[in-house]
Structure formats: structure tokens, C-alpha cells
Design a protein with these regions (language model features):
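Helix-to-loop junction immediately C-terminal to a conserved catalytic motif
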Residues: 48
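Conserved ABC transporter NBD signature motif
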Residues: 56-64, 76, 110-114, 119
């Protein structure tokens, strides 16, 4: 599905990422972990075409995307739920979802995907005609995730989904991510500072420190790792 090799990227003369390499398989949830300033955001921007890598490759479904535009990458099926949600606050929930379904081939396809989204997030059916800006923070995050997945992407990037949310809302969103991966084969890149939450639903993970991959392993291996426990879990 996604294979990143030897990735270097940054801003102008300042390099942030140093030879990052990682993979995400079909229907797999992979956590990208690290503290603020570790390089997670730059990595996401490099994968989605917002930042152009200076060195390395980003191969998705066998195609090199490192020099492609963000729109091209989006059309290939890589969709990001950005940190901060970035909803159209004066538009209704349904209108926000329609904005995410720009690639739906037919109205019937959109309605089928909409029903799937409502099944995953029942509260959004109740709020369909409500302005997105009037929702709670947790409900707004649900709309942001739903808008990203209504087009049924191949790879969903969740960027800090737990930020500022109550634990029960985070659990609900991560449960939907697990369902998508298991039932629909959608791959998930989970970019998180909350390592406990991330590893609770991920299959594997990578820890980024100072723009480099410091550790990698299964969720169980990383949870048991002494460096992870001391540096990130406070154990």
C-alpha cells in the first residue's frame, strides 16, 4: 500500500526529516508516534504532497508520488483529517459531508457511503441539518473524520485525533478507524502524541525523534519497550 524510503524533507534550508522509512499495508492501522517537534507534521505533509521531499520516495499502490501534487495524491485515495478539524462552520453537517464526496461517481454511490458514515457515527444523522460550528468539539471531530472517509479512501491519515477531546470521544473515533480497517480494508496512519491511545488500536507503530525513526515494532512490542515507557508513558 504505502512504502516510504529514505525520506528527507523540510522548509527552505532547514531539514526536518532524515532518511525516514516506513510501510503501511492494506487494512493496517499504523501509529506514527512522537512528541511535539519530532517531525510528525512534516512527514504527513511530505506524504500528502504539501511539502516536496528533497530525497527519498513515497510509493503508494506501486506508484511514485514524491513529486506529485496534493490534488493528484488525494485523487489516488490518500485523505487526511487535519489537526484542528477545519470544518466549514456555517455549513450544515450534511453539507460538510457533501464537500468530502466530490469524487462520488453517482448520487446513489454518495447515499450509500453516507449511510455507512451514519452507521459509524449515529450522532451525525441527528445533527445533519445543524450548522457544524454549533456542535461540540467531539462532534466536530466526528464530522471531520466522516468528511474524510465518505469518499472511501484507500489510506486515511488521522492527525492528532485526540487533541482537546474527552477520552470517550477519542475511543469512539478510534473504534471507527478499527472497523474501517477490518471490514472495509481502509488503511489508517494514526499520527498521535497520546501513545497509550494510539497503541491500543494500532497493529504496528513507529516512534519519530528528531526527524528520524527511533523505534518500530508491533503495538505490543512498543508498549513493552523500556524507552517508550520511560520517555512517553511516564512509567
Amino acid at each position: 500500500m504505502l512504502k516510504v524510503e529514505g525520506l528527507r524533507a523540510g522548509y527552505g534550508a532547514i531539514n526536518i526529516l532524515w532518511d525516514l522509512s516506513f510501510t503501511i499495508g492494506d487494512g493496517e492501522i499504523v501509529a506514527i508516534l512522537g512528541s511535539n517537534g519530532a517531525g510528525k507534521t512534516t512527514m504527513v505533509r511530505a506524504v500528502t504532497g504539501i511539502v516536496r521531499p528533497s530525497v527519498g520516495s513515497v510509493v503508494f499502490d506501486g506508484e511514485e508520488l514524491a513529486k506529485k501534487s496534493s490534488r493528484y495524491i488525494l485523487d489516488k485515495g490518500i485523505v487526511q483529517v487535519p489537526e484542528g478539524r477545519q470544518l466549514f462552520t456555517e455549513m450544515t453537517v450534511l453539507e460538510n459531508l457533501e464537500m468530502g464526496a466530490f469524487n462520488a461517481a453517482t448520487q446513489a454511490a454518495f447515499e450509500k457511503n453516507l449511510e455507512t458514515v451514519y452507521r459509524w457515527f449515529p450522532k451525525l444523522r441527528e445533527r445533519a441539518k445543524q450548522a457544524a460550528g454549533t456542535l461540540s468539539g467531539g462532534e466536530q471531530q466526528m464530522v471531520a473524520v466522516a468528511r474524510a472517509i465518505i469518499g472511501m479512501p484507500k489510506l486515511l491519515i488521522l492527525d492528532e485525533p485526540s487533541l482537546g477531546l474527552a477520552p470517550n470521544i477519542v475511543d469512539e473515533i478510534l473504534a471507527v478507524a478499527s472497523t474501517m480497517a477490518k471490514e472495509d480494508g481502509i488503511s489508517v496512519m494514526l499520527v498521535e502524541q497520546d501513545i497509550t491511545k494510539a497503541l491500543s488500536c494500532a497493529d504496528r507503530g513507529y516512534v519519530i525523534e528528531n526527524g528520524r525513526i527511533a523505534l518500530e515494532g508491533t503495538a505490543a512490542e512498543l508498549s513493552a519497550n523500556e524507552h517508550v515507557k520511560k520517555a512517553y508513558l511516564g512509567i
